[in-house]
Amino acid sequence: MLKTEPNDSFLNYALALEFAKANDVHKAIELIENVLLREVNYLGAYYQLGKFYEQIQDLPKAIDTYTKGIAIAKSIKNNKALGELNEALWMLED
């Protein structure tokens, strides 16, 4: 499906999760960063990208990612995503 729809955000997000399962977190990060370049409001990607940054111990990038996601969630009034991102950030800063 990616061959016919290479810019499909959902497909790229799902592929990133598969790379992460295969322990290729750096490839997963690359794919999700590309998703966010194309679709800035893809809120689930901020949470997952932050978690991937935590996995590789890049805490400043994790914090930045969660913070960006929080701003987007507020702007589009997505309280569920806002709560998840706030909690992830809080757990990191605790």
Write out the residue ranges for each language-model feature.
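Canonical positions in the second alpha-helix
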Residues: 1, 34-35, 69
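Structural marker of alpha-solenoid helical repeat scaffolds
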Residues: 4, 38, 72-76
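TPR alpha-solenoid repeat register
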Residues: 11, 45, 78-79, 85
